[in-house]
């Protein structure tokens, strides 16, 4: 065959490839897409015996189409594996990286474990060292899988490598993303000093070395979310306020109508095509941390208001595209609102919302959300069971929670509630055992100030029940010191009302009144019906002792009102179909039918807003402590 004939044949083949690819794209983008014909066009390419690179790219495209538009996962896998086997040995050919990334995603969807996905990505990371974009993208993807598997040290190491690679390529924006992602991992590992050092380092770079104002503001939101979460994890509700205010202002800036789209901000430079979360999801996340802050500070009305706004926003986003992260946000918000409802005495609403959280978890593919939130659901059902005086059910729920979770704060939270159950059911041996265990475990390790304040509160309650009033005062003053330092209003009101009861028990009516008055003021502000019920009983006794008949009558009337509200709510609870959840101790939670959770109220947009992916991706999470009956 002459050279001219060979050239002509090659040109003719190229024209066929281009025509078939163009036709395939035409069918893919038709309205509605004609995927069958699109696949037929791509399949036809193979009849021309294309060169290796064209063949590999076509197999990749077939895999992409099958994954995106069909349920034929096996055929998608075959095409992607073929693309990988052809492209892996070819130098300077990015198709291998795209294929590895997709194959890893497919393995995660279909395999029982993540071993194959990790192995695929590790090999791709090795091969991509001369391609900064793909090297960083694959490092992020692999780190995310390790983080999801709770292999935090491995995730942290990969992110450190990514930060170095970005630094060597002078990709400052990308370097900061790696630093902040690593800070998040270290936060989960409770390496607080390392977190602080990384946040300080990233903060300085954001302030001084990010020239693009839009990227700078975006990184600032990521940084401030982590800073707020850091303080909230420490229970530092007062300390966090300036950072939270800054975060709320930054998200307003990003959500303004004149703010450019994410594509415009991150699409110009390949090494800047990475985002942690799109701005619409960041908006929901800021609501979420605001809800968490309101809960810990003891502002239940605020927490409810922001939860309703956040849930409304989530539903809007779900209508556009139902991303898995939105379900994560929804579950966390429902977990918070359940605790609000119980503090306010709305337990029937609480069990409805626990059922709603269960439904969201059950709807997620492969029960992934249920695995991550099962312990929290058991804990919430334990709180609900306690509040309806089902102590045996509550105990079993908390024991399951402790056995299922590896989160130390959640374990401490459940154990403190177990201690209160043992106290109320007069199981002194079990109580001593759990208090000793909590004390030993938390003496030399970091814990939330709110939870440690709660621990002192439980010890004060224990001393009160033993009639060791001096010891009770000592513990409760320690609790008050911690609560007042960080504006933990609910812990303050609970401690004050118990301290008032201590003084009443030793006949010091003046000090008792000095304690119960601010306790009731705080309780009405929260509002906390349990503290109000307790405080009104103390006030009734104090007014009777001082022969103040009118005030005694008023206190008694209030006590009856709070009591009747709780009794009426209790009646609704036991009649609810969702009440059956108290009997769920293992496996999947039972399906219960009943009234849905309270409807989300459509409110005007707020001027301030309120387990997210741990790692940034390419542009294509706190229990407050409390009261006599239980901790919420």
From Swiss-Prot:
Its annotated compartments are:
Nucleus, Nucleoplasm
Per its UniProt entry, which superkingdom is the organism in?
Eukaryota
Could you state one GO cellular component term attached to this entry? SMC loading complex
- InterPro entries in the record, alphabetically? MAU2, TPR-like_helical_dom_sf
Q: Which Gene3D superfamilies match?
A: Tetratricopeptide repeat domain
In this chain the TPR repeats are located at 453-486, 493-526
Tell me yes or no: is Cell cycle among this UniProt entry's keywords.
Answer: yes
- SUPFAM superfamilies, per this entry? TPR-like
Keywords, alphabetical: Cell cycle, Cell division, Chromosome partition, Mitosis, Nucleus, Repeat, TPR repeat
Q: Which Pfam families match?
A: Cohesin_load (PF10345)
Supply the PANTHER family for this chain. MAU2 CHROMATID COHESION FACTOR HOMOLOG
Function of the protein = Required for association of the cohesin complex with chromatin during interphase. Plays a role in sister chromatid cohesion and normal progression through prometaphase.
What's the protein here called?
MAU2 chromatid cohesion factor homolog
The protein's organism comes out as Drosophila melanogaster (Fruit fly)
Lineage, highest ranks first: Eukaryota, Metazoa, Ecdysozoa, Arthropoda, Hexapoda
